[in-house]
């Protein structure tokens, strides 16, 4: 009898967690609904925001992020002179990726190539932040004819020995466990760790008060954000070695902007050391943390405009 009661209580607790996750998912969507356009690209339904006219810039966000990381402050100023396309990576934000689909970093780069084909765009400047930097590098290696230049902001370029402590809860190898946690404990855990996580991800700078809505932070309360981020973390482990092997043969003009006090990725390994790994790479170091597209908009804007101006012939 006691065993039955324990099973009953466990079942009710699990049901409560699932219902809370569903409620959180719904509220996040209500507060920050899709703001762009959808394109069916193979197995991926990609959500993107397309604004401005001129030479094309494609912006690729990082782990557990979404396109609002760029629309927060970078996209609109750039759109005065460029056509700026901010994407929700496959499975992130409002982009959809089935569980059976190839979710490697290379496959995500291929999806971006499909987006350019879908929009009849021959080539673009790619701006990649964090994990989006690694995917942009894969894009330049696999589809060099489609990449005019790379402007990488705090990019993942080197596979570390393990994930940053703030991302340890995402380090789950089993897709089944990942799914179960995503719809039970992940959202309460995210809420519990929110303030501590933001201090690391943004530190030593502070997360702006309006980041939840303007910067897309509230979408972290969607179960699929956890599920996709956990999957992406595993995919980075398997994809990065081959991406790193490709550095020596790259000819795409590549520039990197990195914060010296980045608490998520090593500035030395992912920034400073890259000058010896990719020929001609231009490195800019600033005082700051990992979320430069949000915390240092003017610096990031100047960086992207300089890279894009050289690549497209427009004055920076």
Q: What spans do the regions from the language model cover?
A:
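Alpha/beta-hydrolase fold catalytic core
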Residues: 1-57, 80-82, 122, 309-316
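Flexible "cap/lid" loop of the alpha/beta hydrolase fold
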Residues: 141, 150-182
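Catalytic histidine-centered segment of alpha/beta-hydrolase-like enzymes
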Residues: 289-301
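Conserved HGGG/HGGXW glycine-rich cap/lid loop of the alpha/beta-hydrolase fold
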Residues: 51-94
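Active-site loop/oxyanion-hole signature of alpha/beta-hydrolase fold enzymes
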Residues: 42-43, 49-51, 86-127, 131
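Acidic catalytic loop of the alpha/beta-hydrolase fold
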Residues: 261-265, 291
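Short beta-strand/loop motif that positions the catalytic acidic residue
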Residues: 250, 256-258
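Conserved alpha/beta-hydrolase catalytic His-Asp/Glu region
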Residues: 26-28, 164, 186-249
């Amino acid at each position: 009898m006691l065993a039955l009661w324990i099973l009953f209580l466990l079942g009710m607790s699990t049901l409560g967690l699932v219902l809370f996750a569903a409620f959180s998912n719904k509220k996040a969507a209500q507060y920050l609904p899709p703001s762009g356009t959808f394109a069916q690209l193979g197995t991926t339904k990609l959500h993107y925001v397309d604004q401005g006219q001129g030479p094309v810039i494609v912006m690729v966000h990082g782990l557990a992020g979404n396109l609002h990381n760029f629309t927060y402050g970078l996209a609109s100023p750039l759109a005065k002179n460029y056509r700026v396309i901010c994407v929700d990576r496959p499975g992130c934000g409002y982009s959809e990726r089935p569980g059976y689909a190839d979710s490697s970093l290379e496959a995500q780069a291929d999806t971006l190539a499909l987006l350019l084909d879908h929009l009849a765009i021959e080539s673009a400047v790619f701006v990649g932040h964090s994990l989006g930097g690694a995917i942009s590098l894969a894009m330049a290696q696999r589809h060099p004819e489609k990449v005019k230049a790379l402007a990488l902001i705090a990019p993942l370029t080197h596979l570390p020995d393990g994930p940053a402590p703030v991302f340890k809860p995402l380090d789950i190898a089993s897709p089944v466990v990942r799914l179960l946690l995503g719809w039970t404990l992940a959202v309460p855990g995210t809420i519990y760790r929110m303030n501590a996580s933001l201090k690391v991800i943004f530190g030593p700078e502070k997360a702006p008060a309006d980041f939840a809505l303007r910067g897309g932070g509230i979408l972290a309360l969607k179960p699929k954000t956890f599920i996709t981020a956990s999957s992406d973390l595993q995919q980075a482990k398997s994809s990065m070695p081959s991406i790193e092997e490709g550095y020596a043969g790259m000819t795409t003009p590549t520039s990197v902007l990195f914060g010296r006090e980045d608490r998520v990725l090593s500035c030395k390994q992912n920034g400073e050391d890259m000058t010896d790994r990719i020929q001609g790479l231009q490195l800019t170091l600033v005082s700051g943390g990992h979320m430069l597209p949000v915390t240092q908009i003017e610096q990031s804007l100047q960086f992207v405009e300089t890279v894009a101006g050289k690549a497209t012939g427009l004055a920076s």
